């Protein structure tokens, strides 16, 4: 089978949104080439050696590569992708150079092209993300392993916004909690919450592709008895009170349901928000405060911000 590789040179701010556009267009895998990977400090407790080739990364910005099957609809699909990316500017998202190139690869090249970017990664004090084809032994008794298949939609779980959410969940989720994950994507945050001891987790997403992806990952990680995955628009029609609500989505979307989050949380409940670029930090902070939340902690990683807010 022939595949078409679409390569988009953009900004850190636009990575999440463009990745979602590509997944929704039917991409069979997405690769993110971020030059930050070349200088990022990595866990070397056990003598690991990381060797990355600078030629695989842009000098500035980020390159997102997606793989689409070559068929009679390819031209139309590419045009729809271009239009959707341009529309991001309507939401004040900087798409940068937005240079788009297209090339053709065969099945074997595609299968190995994205695997080289994905290895077991320790993303927090307790969690390590492991690709499904890797054999990995926990290095301590309290290490928690999340298995993901990056050939499925919604990336590898190592984006800064996801990492900060998981770190925040580690600090806030208690045994027996009810957790709501808004915009679940791959389901990784719901899986983490279940592994941390939550009694009930509601994983919500409007995108049917995300719902199916999350269901598969939840089953893969054997937490399907705790996590319920549903197609839902934000917190619409949700009435069960929660101890923790987590949302790793665009700042503009967070502000749409901040009041609903406050209403749904129990007293002293926690609202974890991520997916916030630095330029939107103050806007989201003010929205949280207006809704009645207090900011317990602000997390930052690269150009991204996450808030841990509490209902009083």
Swiss-Prot record:
Enzyme class, first EC level, given as a word: transferase
Cellular-component GO terms for this entry: cytoplasm
Transmembrane segments: none
Transport among keywords: no
Keywords attached to this entry: Cytoplasm, Methyltransferase, S-adenosyl-L-methionine, Transferase
Biological process according to GO: methylation
Database matches in Pfam families: PrmA
Location of this chain's protein in the cell: Cytoplasm
Positions annotated to bind S-adenosyl-L-methionine: 162, 183, 205, 248
Molecular function GO labels: protein-lysine N-methyltransferase activity
Keyword Transferase: yes
Catalytic activities: L-lysyl-[protein] + 3 S-adenosyl-L-methionine = N(6),N(6),N(6)-trimethyl-L-lysyl-[protein] + 3 S-adenosyl-L-homocysteine + 3 H(+)
This enzyme's EC code(s): 2.1.1.-
InterPro entries hit by this protein: Ribosomal_L11_MeTrfase_PrmA, Ribosomal_PrmA_MeTrfase, SAM-dependent_MTases_sf
Gene3D superfamilies associated with the record: Vaccinia Virus protein VP39 (3.40.50.150)
Family the UniProt entry places it in: Belongs to the methyltransferase superfamily. PrmA family.
Function (record text): Methylates ribosomal protein L11.
Name of the featured protein: Ribosomal protein L11 methyltransferase
